[in-house]
Structures are given as C-alpha cells and as structure tokens.
Amino acid sequence: MTQFRTIVADPPWRYENRASRAAAENHYPTMSTDELCELSVVPEHAARDSHLYLWTTNSHLADGLKVMAAWGFEYKTSLVWVKPQMGMGNYFRGSTELVLFGTRGGLPTLRKDVRNHFTAPRRAHSRKPREFLELVVASSPGPYLELFARCSGDADCACSRCLFGWATWGDQSGGNPSQGVLETRHGRPLCGRCFQPVPKPKRGPSGVWCSAACRTAAWRERRG
C-alpha cells in the first residue's frame, strides 16, 4: 500500500443552512462531519511522518478541526486563500477560504519563507487555484495524494493530477490512490459518486458504485 507524505483533502462539506446546503448539492453530493471522520483512507495511506492540508469553510472551522483529529493529525496552523472577488455571507461578505495544516509525526516543512496566505481569483465551483498547489509542493515532500479531487480532463486543466502527476481520488478525478475505494473505518466501501456506504457494491474499472445510476452519472461528469 502506497504511503503518502503529503495529503490534500477538499471535503464536500454539508451545510445545515438550507439555502447554503442546496447551493452546494447543486454541484456535488455532500457528506456530514461524522461521515468524513469515519473515512479510513487518510489514516491508512498517510505515512508515519506526513502533512495534511484540509480545506474548510469559515463556517466549518470546528468541523475541520474535528475531522483532522479523527484522521490522526495534529493541527498546527492555517493558510488563507484571499479572493479578489467578494462573495456571499450571512454576517460578512466572504472573500477568504481556509486550509487547515496538520502534521503526523515529526515531518518539518521544506522551507521557512512561505507565507500563510495567497491571493488568487475564484475558479469554477469548488476548484482550487494553482497557486495553492505550488505552495504545497514548495512546502511539503511527496509522494502526494489529493482526496475529493476534480479534474475537467481538458488540455488546460489545472488540477493536481494534470499539473504535477499526483495520485488523486474523487468523484470527478478519474483516479484512485490504491486501485481500491474509499472505506469507512468499519470496512464498508463508499460509493464513488454519492459517498454513501455500499452494502452490495457494483465495481467498475475506476471505482465502486451503489447503483448503475451513480456509475453512469460519474461517467458523464468525467466526460463533461
């Protein structure tokens, strides 16, 4: 089993606010905090000494810390993505996004001159900027794994797999870290499309699906 020294995760956070939840689920299936904590892929694939970059929203800060601890990492600091464009918000207009940085074991960063913020414009929903990936490569050693990755498959795609050859897993990534599937800590496989436990999985060449409908939907998304 491949052990990764750097893992990036961009979970599909589920919102309690009905409007925000509907907005997210228009783009992809979401997962609850407890469901994310149950995932075994990070503890199983993280090297003894490794780094975790965990994307979270400002409203999911406490949830992000809970998930990081459940995956066996100790929170150290945060990175901030500053977006020139102003977004929505319940109290203040959002223009930032957080990345929680945690460590397992005693792995230091590669450099000591990297700032804890970066500025980059918004991309398509949930897609993260190239500037972030460059920061990760400058700060943390490989091999690299990205969970919940998104790959457009276009010639100008700027995902971690297309740019840097990372191992990826996600319903729109087309990759898998171990030729297997995401599982809960109890060994139950999760559907590669809706992330729900699958009692009788339907296996395909690029993942496991709870139904033919999910398998077809994932194929269509990859095809664009």
Q: Model features per residue range: what roles?
A:
Residues 183-224:
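BZIP DNA-binding basic region
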